[in-house]
């Protein structure tokens, strides 16, 4: 069985943790003590997962538990958590699901985006691995077309997406995925609440910034966690010029 096949079967589990990924960038640059430690899912993560599944793998939507409650403080919601066999601390509310379903409907209803996302020959949720900077990295591409990688995003503000892209390390994601799959990345984005949409391409400056982040993250990883680590993680501190 190839490394890629093993990773496809256990992307988020023990096998997946052998690799670095873009989701590790924040921890390595901001809080390396939290590197590779399990974290409880947040509401934006859960909503993002549902949106991606509805857009790309709708046959898996039954995996999501939906609770018809007004808030997460209600008795109905708390009982649903207690009675669930799932190891989770959060479910989607019905009203949240309804909003996400509307986002899916709107994005699918845009002819340009529909043709890009569902073009014949596209592949979905494809895993890639590669040695970058002396370490093995992984990535899972939402959509790969004949020409590019398409990543679907939700945002609270289309106007501020360019700033969110830096904050949430979409620049390093675009650079890493270019290395993994050999194609440029574009982002198709939908704004929560208003359902306004946008298509964002990646400039050379954006990619260079992502490459620089990856380089710094690799330095931290190799210093504190790599096979030839030289320093104790408890000695880490952030050093910046104001």
Predicted regions and their residues:
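Mg2+/Mn2+-dependent nuclease catalytic core
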Residues: 119-122, 126-212
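Polybasic (Lys/Arg-rich)
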Residues: 214-242
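Short helix-capping/linker segments at secondary-structure and domain boundaries
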Residues: 57-63, 182-185, 226
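Short cationic/low-complexity microdomains
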Residues: 31, 208-219
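Metal-dependent nuclease catalytic cores that hydrolyze phosphodiester bonds in DNA/RNA
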Residues: 1-138, 234-240
């Amino acid at each position: 069985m190839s490394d890629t096949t093993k990773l496809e079967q256990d992307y988020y589990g023990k096998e997946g943790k052998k690799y670095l990924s873009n989701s590790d960038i924040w921890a390595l640059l901001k809080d390396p003590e939290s590197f590779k430690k399990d974290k409880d899912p947040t509401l934006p993560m859960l909503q993002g997962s549902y949106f991606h599944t509805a857009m790309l793998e709708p046959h898996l939507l039954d995996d999501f538990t939906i609770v018809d409650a007004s808030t997460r403080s209600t008795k109905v919601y708390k009982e649903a958590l207690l009675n669930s066999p799932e190891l989770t601390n959060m479910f989607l509310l019905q009203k949240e699901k309804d909003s996400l379903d509307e986002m899916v409907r709107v994005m699918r209803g845009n002819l340009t985006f529909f043709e890009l996302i569902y073009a014949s020959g596209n592949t979905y949720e494809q895993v890639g691995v590669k040695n970058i900077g002396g370490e093995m990295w992984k990535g899972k591409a939402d959509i790969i077309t004949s020409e590019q990688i398409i990543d679907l995003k939700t945002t609270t503000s289309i106007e501020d997406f360019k700033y969110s892209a830096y904050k949430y390390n979409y620049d390093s994601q675009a650079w890493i995925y270019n290395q993994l799959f050999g194609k440029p990345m574009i982002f198709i984005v939908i704004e929560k609440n208003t359902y306004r949409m946008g298509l964002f391409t990646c400039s050379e400056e954006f990619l260079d910034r992502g490459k620089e982040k990856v380089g710094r993250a690799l330095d931290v990883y190799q210093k504190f966690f790599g096979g030839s680590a030289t320093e104790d993680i408890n000695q880490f501190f952030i050093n910046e010029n104001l």
